[in-house]
Structures are given as C-alpha cells and as structure tokens.
UniProtKB/Swiss-Prot annotation:
Polycomb group (PcG) protein. Catalytic subunit of the PRC2/EED-EZH1 complex, which methylates 'Lys-27' of histone H3, leading to transcriptional repression of the affected target gene. Able to mono-, di- and trimethylate 'Lys-27' of histone H3 to form H3K27me1, H3K27me2 and H3K27me3, respectively. Required for embryonic stem cell derivation and self-renewal, suggesting that it is involved in safeguarding embryonic stem cell identity. SMART domains: CXC (SM01114), SANT (SM00717), SET (SM00317). Signal peptide: none annotated. GO terms for biological process: heterochromatin formation; methylation. Residues 395-414 have a biased composition (Polar residues). This is Histone-lysine N-methyltransferase EZH1. Component of the PRC2/EED-EZH1 complex, which includes EED, EZH1, SUZ12, RBBP4 and AEBP2. The PRC2/EED-EZH1 is less abundant than the PRC2/EED-EZH2 complex, has weak methyltransferase activity and compacts chromatin in the absence of the methyltransferase cofactor S-adenosyl-L-methionine (SAM). Interacts with EZHIP; the interaction blocks EZH1 methyltransferase activity. Residues 613-728 form the SET domain. It catalyses: L-lysyl(27)-[histone H3] + 3 S-adenosyl-L-methionine = N(6),N(6),N(6)-trimethyl-L-lysyl(27)-[histone H3] + 3 S-adenosyl-L-homocysteine + 3 H(+). The lineage of its organism: Eukaryota, Metazoa, Chordata, Craniata, Vertebrata.
Length: 747
C-alpha cells in the first residue's frame, strides 16, 4: 500500500494563496450580486410607481374642474391677517381669506414599538449583534468607543456581515460551500494531469484494441466520474483552517461540508421516527416509542404543547394519582367478554386494584389447571413499578409467549417466590389478526387502564375484550400492575401537617437571614435516593415541588396550606414562603375551586388565574408614557403581572449597555438565573414610572414552580391615578434617569 507523502511547505503556500484569492473573489461576487439585486428592485419598484402615476393622471384628465365661488372677506377684524390665494388655472380669480392661527399642540411622547404579552416568553441568548443601533450624532461624537465596545461584547459577530467585514473570520455555509467547490476544481485539474502522465504507458500498451472498444471503455469511465462526485482533498480543508482558524479544525470543516452536501430523500423518515399510527405504514412499536413525541412536545408543567416558558420538560411523574380510576367490573360487558371464560371472575377479584382481598380469599378463589403444572415454577412476581411512562420496551417483549401457549400465564426467565398464579381455561378459537396500529394502541392504553380489558376494548373499537385479553396474555402483560405500596402510599397527614407550618417558617427564616439570592427552580430527578445535600432543590434552597421525582414523603416537599380564610397573612404557610397557593396542594382555602375564577375565597392565587386590573395608557406627568388604573384597588391587592422576555443574566448585561445609552430600561431581575425584559415584548404595566414615594410595589412570587413578578398596591389607590413603583435605583442612577419626581398629593 502506498503511503501518501506529507505536504511540503511549497504545497501549503500554494493552497493558502488559492484560498485567499478565491475567498476575495467570492466576497467581490457577493457584493456585486447584492448591488445588482438592489438595482433590480429599484428599477422594478420605479416602474410600478410610474405605472400607477400614469393611471392617476389619466383619471384626473377625465374629471371636470369647476371654479369655486369667491368668498367675501369679513371686515371689522383688525387683528386678523388677510391671506390671498392665487390659483394656477388662468380662468380662476384670486381669493382673499382671513387667517386664523391654531394654538400649539403638545407633542405625543416617543414610544418604541413593542409586542403585547400576557405571560413571560423565554428566548435564547443573542450571540450575534442583529444591528448596530443608531444613538444619534451626539453619542457618536461624545463616546466614539461605544460601538466598538458593543461589537466586542458580541465577539465581533454582526448579523449579515460575516463575509463583508474586512478581516472577518466567520464564513457562512453558502460561502463555505462555494469556496470548497472552487478550490476543488484546482485539485481535480492537478489529479487529471497526474493521471494523464501515469496512464500514458497503459494507453500505449492497449493501442492494439479496436477503436470501438476503446471508445466504449472511455465512455464508461467518463460516465462513472461524472456520476460520482469526488470528495475534496484534505489539503483544501487544512488550508482553509490555517487561513481562518476560528472556523474550526480541518476535521470539523470536513464534517461540515459533508452535512451540507448530503442529498436527503424528501420522503424518507428521520432515523428515530415512528410512522403515523393512523397511516397505512403504521408499525407495532412499544409504548415509550408511541408516546415519544407526546413526552417531547408536551409540557407537564403547563399542560400544553410547544411550551415557550420552560427550556426543558419535566419527566413524567412516577407516582399514581390518589383517586384511582381503575376498576374491573365483576359482571360481563357482553357475550364476548373475557369474564365469561372459566376462572376469569376469580381473576377479576384478585387483580382489581380497589379490592382489598385477604390471603384467605386469595387461596379460596385460586384455581389450578393440570396444564399449568409444568410452568408453575416460573410464575411471575409482581414487581414494584411506577407509571408506565418510565417503563422500557424490553419489559414488554413477547419472548415467553411461545412457552405459554399451553398455560395462559406469562413467565419470566428468572423465577421469584410468589403466590400461585391463576390459569384461565378457554375454548379454542381462530387466531385474530392485529394490525400494527392496534397493537401500539393497546400498549398505550394498558399503561393507564392496566387489566381493565373491557375499557381498553371500548377504546380500540375494533376488538372484543376477550380478544384484548388473549393478546395481553400473549404480550406477557397480564400481571403488570403497580403494587399497592405505590398505588396507595402511606399518608400520615394529621400530625405531619401541623409540623409543616413550623417547618416552613424555619426554612423561610433561614432563607431570609442567610442570603437574599433566589435561584430558578428545576425539578429534581433521583427517585432511588432521598433528597440530601446533592439534591438540586436543596442546593438552591428551593422546596421540592409536585414536579419533582422524589418520594412524596420527602421532607423538602412543600405541603401546601390548610387555611380556612383568605391566605393573605403570614399565618398561611404559602404566603409566608412568598408563593401562591397551589390548587393541587391547597384543598381547603379555595384555591382548588375552579367554578368561578373571580369569586374565590383564597386571595393568594391571583397571578396564576390572571385576575389583573383594567389599566390605561396615557402620557405621564413625570416622563414619557404612564400607566393609569381604571378602577380603585385596596392595599396589597394584586394589580398586574410584569411580563416580558425571559433572558439570561449575560444577555441582560449585553442589552443593558444599549438601554443605558437610550436612558430607558425595562429590565427586571427575576432570580439569579433569569431577567424579565419588557422592551420588545410586554404588557401595559411596563409603562409604570419610577418614584421614591410609590403607590405600588413589586414582589417575585413562586407560582406553580415558576418565579413571576407581581405588582401590588402599596396603599389604597383611587380610579384614574397613575401607577408608580420603586425601581430601586442607586442614588446616582436615580438622578440620572429620573429627572422629575411626582407630587405626593395623596398621603
């Protein structure tokens, strides 16, 4: 095997020179194409304007111009000036009018465009500067280094100018492809010249072949070369990487070129894609594969698809609901019910999750068939399993279905001690064909309804419950039930809940005394071990919420409240912990009542229900625009939520440098991880101005696992008053940004 010689310095210099020349040519070509495109658009728009103008001129020529009767000037007004109006038409006489001056109208305050929002919207960090903001000639002359510092904050990355800025090292995908293809032509020419010299002897030795055979052979070789495009030489990527090192190493560039040039079949499915369950190509897949899109796109915290508030989705809860909805009816549902099989009623009594059968009753209803004697040693033990959302498809393999053809009980490879299992005897029947969609749907339904085959059959609609039962036996899912320990977790609430209020107070006082830092909540996911010092909730001094995967008896879980009043004092554990009452935890205060969202006894659930006041937008007496309230509110009453874009602290620092130059900022710290920016997106409360004597105050509240900013009344506010709250500026910033302080008429 021939080992390629390493490239010489002369070769490297040659390729670098080619890279530089081709890159400059492509840059010039891009500029020329941009200029030509702008000229073409200008010519097209100018032609459209000329066409419209010509049509209007033709219409004006068809109209008849009638002279206006002269108005006699009114005498006796010595202070009014007299104006003369002369017409351009020769047939019209001049007109004389008295001039009446209008009073000066106050200008409307400047307002920048913004999009209305009703809740926070999380966005990604902008690592590329979208545009260079115009600050005016004054800022440009006084602070010449501002634009340079702004570009440096984005590492010199400006949108749309990767290839145009001199000295830029970023190459877009389009220019990268064109550059590699252009350099590849030089590589092909070199190889062709080398092949011509090396293959000369072979061609001379085959001159005795007929002319027709030689032409045919050359035609076949030419077609092969044209059909298969040669991958660029490694020297090309090495030369580009040496000229533009910030774009990556040669291996990265090679992989980038391969991804950009791969031809994808438009009809081909992604590698990890399940065919549509309602389509003709539906396949029989496991439950986790059928629900993959559901678990990926559905947010378990917001209960909606494509959630734009949480960057990640919590894993499905491994614990079942308290109000169990699984029940096997003791009576058959029809003539084809599986309960009509011999021993099926005993099976229903034994495997009903709601029934509390004693061991004596289990032994009395136990039925053993002679055909089961050989397989009794490999009986299935009920394993401790949670919600089937976390089960893997390997547990549902039907590898043991052949061994269970005689005895209708599933088995596993490893035997475990368990009570003797029930065997159901049935009459031989014809095999029923199941489609891939039906099998997949059955596995999805079985994770919710378990052994309630009558309900599963009604949901399928194409199979009887007897056929569903037979398929379940074949799938080895007959005993795949959650244990009573997980279905009915031990509840020790009476004494435990009284201790929780003191526990919450201790934790809250500890948080208040130690630090004022608030961290974003992320659900913990360690179901096999308790919450200790390594738990993310404890590390960030957050409570474990209902979205966490820890045990329900976790000492760090927040239990909610059992208040009977309005939950607006520190006697309420939720109010003390600066959080709203959770409708899933607080069942006695009224937070869980959803009959009327406005008439509710609990006063600590206003943000999650959106019980905001009617706000008005008008010019402010202090600065710019202001927010006014249309209805009167009482002290500590919820007014509105401060909504905007959720951005990181680093992104807030980059945006804040621009906002400081504009002397207008809508940034609001949410916690140590995120900031709410209402500059581009927000609601009307964003126009509330700053004051050292405000009538409102802002408070960050935990609402169902999310930090949200609520604006509350600091005192009783009358209808029509302008809303102010303290921005908590420093003394220097307050004098810099707030020039006028409002008059405190109302004490």
């Amino acid at each position: 095997m021939d080992i390629p010689n390493p490239p010489t310095s002369k070769c490297i210099t040659y390729w670098k020179r080619k890279v530089k020349s081709e890159y400059m040519r492509l840059r010039q070509l891009k500029r020329l194409q941009a200029n030509m495109g702008a000229k073409a658009l200008y010519v097209a728009n100018f032609a459209k304007v000329q066409e419209k103008t010509q049509i209007l001129n033709e219409e004006w020529k068809k109209l008849r111009v009638q002279p206006v009767q002269l108005m006699k000037p009114v005498s006796g007004h010595p202070f009014l000036k007299k104006c003369t109006i002369e017409s351009i038409f020769p047939g019209f006489a001049s007109q004389h009018m008295l001039m009446r001056s209008l009073n000066t109208v106050a200008l409307v305050p400047i307002m920048y465009s913004w999009s209305p929002l009703q809740q926070n919207f999380m966005v990604e960090d902008e690592t590329v500067l979208c545009n260079i903001p115009y600050m005016g000639d004054e800022v440009k002359e006084e602070d010449e280094t501002f634009i340079e510092e702004l570009i440096n904050n984005y590492d010199g990355k400006v949108h749309g100018e990767e290839e145009m800025i001199p000295g830029s090292v970023l190459i877009s995908d389009a220019v990268f492809l064109e550059l590699v293809d252009a350099l590849n032509q030089y590589s092909d020419e070199d190889e062709e010249g080398h092949n011509d010299t090396s293959d000369g002897k072979q061609d001379d030795s085959k001159e005795d072949l007929p002319v027709t055979r030689k032409r045919k052979r050359h035609a076949i070789e030419g077609s092969k070369k044209s059909s298969k495009k040669q991958f660029p030489n490694d020297m090309i990527f090495s030369a580009i990487a040496s000229m533009f090192p910030e774009n990556g190493v040669p291996d990265d560039m090679k992989e980038r070129y391969r991804e950009l040039t791969e031809m994808s079949d438009p009809n081909a499915l992604p590698p990890q894609c399940t065919p549509n369950i309602d389509g003709p190509n539906a396949k029989s897949v496991q439950r986790e594969q059928s629900l993959h899109s559901f678990h990926t796109l559905f947010c378990r915290r917001c209960f909606k698809y494509d959630c734009f508030l949480h960057p990640f989705h919590a894993t499905p809860n491994v614990y079942k609901r308290k109000n169990k909805e699984i029940k096997i009816e003791p009576e058959p549902c029809g003539t084809d019910c599986f309960l009509l099989l011999e021993g099926a009623k005993e099976y229903a009594m034994l495997h009903n999750p709601r029934s509390k059968c004693s061991g004596r009753r289990r032994r009395r209803h136990h039925v053993v068939n002679a055909s089961c004697s050989n397989t009794s040693a490999s009986a299935v033990a009920e394993t401790k399993e949670g919600d089937s959302d976390r089960d893997t498809g390997n547990d549902w393999a039907s590898s043991s279905s052949e061994a269970n053809s005689r005895c209708q009980t599933p088995t596993k490879q490893k035997a475990s001690p368990a009570p003797p299992q029930l065997c159901v005897v049935e009459a031989p029947s014809e095999p029923v064909e199941w489609t891939g969609a039906e099998e997949s749907l059955f596995r999805v339904f079985h994770g919710t309804y378990f052994n309630n085959f009558c309900s599963i059959a009604r949901l399928l609609g194409t199979k009887t419950c007897k056929q569903v039962f037979q398929f379940a036996v074949k799938e080895s899912l007959i005993l795949k039930l959650p244990t009573d320990e997980l279905m009915n977790p031990s509840q020790k609430k009476k004494r435990k809940h009284r201790l929780w209020a003191a526990h919450c107070r201790k934790i809250q006082l500890k948080k208040d005394n130690s630090s004022t830092q608030v961290y974003n909540y992320q659900p913990c996911d360690h179901p096999d071990r308790p919450c200790d010092s390594t738990c993310p909730c404890i590390m960030t001094q957050n409570f474990c919420e209902k979205f966490c995967q820890c045990n329900p008896d976790c000492q760090n879980r927040f239990p909610g409240c059992r208040c009977k009043t309005q939950c607006n004092t520190k006697q309420c554990p939720c109010y003390l912990a600066v959080r709203e009452c959770d409708p899933d935890l607080c069942l006695t205060c009224g937070a869980s009542e959803h009959w009327d969202c406005k008439v509710v006894s609990c006063k600590n659930c206003s943000i999650q229900r959106g019980l905001k006041k009617h706000l008005l937008l008008a010019p402010s007496d202090v600065a710019g625009w202001g927010t006014f309230i249309k209805e009167s509110v009482q002290k500590n009453e919820f007014i509105s939520e401060y909504c905007g874009e959720l951005i990181s602290q680093d992104e807030a620092d980059r945006r804040g440098k621009v906002y400081d130059k504009y002397m207008s900022s809508f940034l609001f710290n949410l916690n140590n991880d995120f900031v709410v920016d209402a500059t581009r997106k927000g609601n009307k409360i964003r126009f509330a101005n700053h004051s050292v004597n405000p009538n409102c105050y802002a408070k960050v509240v935990m609402v169902n696992g999310d930090h949200r900013i609520g604006i509350f009344a600091k005192r009783a506010i009358q209808a029509g008053e302008e809303l102010f709250f303290d921005y908590r500026y420093s003394q220097a910033d307050a004098l810099k940004y707030v020039g006028i302080e409002r008059e405190t008429d109302v004490l």
